[in-house]
Curated annotation (Swiss-Prot):
Gene3D superfamilies (alphabetical): 2.30.29.80
Lineage: superkingdom: Bacteria
Family annotation (Pfam families): DUF1508 (PF07411)
Signal peptide extent: none
Native organism: Treponema denticola (strain ATCC 35405 / DSM 14222 / CIP 103919 / JCM 8153 / KCTC 15104)
Family: Belongs to the UPF0339 family.
Descriptive protein name: UPF0339 protein TDE_0826
InterPro entries the record matches: DUF1508, UPF0339_domain, YegP-like_sf
């Protein structure tokens, strides 16, 4: 099963997303957004910028 992004509202009624692996484990969580459109933009940013992201120890 492929991973998926889930959009939900938090306790403050803000939109957030979480990325779940194929096994259902949450592997990433986005910040709070005022609008669903902003949340969707955050998801698109992750999709665009992360496919070949380097792993860097800081």
């Amino acid at each position: 099963m492929a991973g998926k992004f889930e959009i939900y509202k938090d306790k403050s009624n803000k939109f957030r997303f979480r990325l779940k692996a194929g096994n259902g484990e949450v592997i990433a969580v986005g910040e709070a957004y005022e609008s669903k459109a902003g949340c969707l933009s955050g998801i698109e940013s992750v999709r665009k910028n992360a496919p070949d992201a380097a792993v860097v120890e800081v």
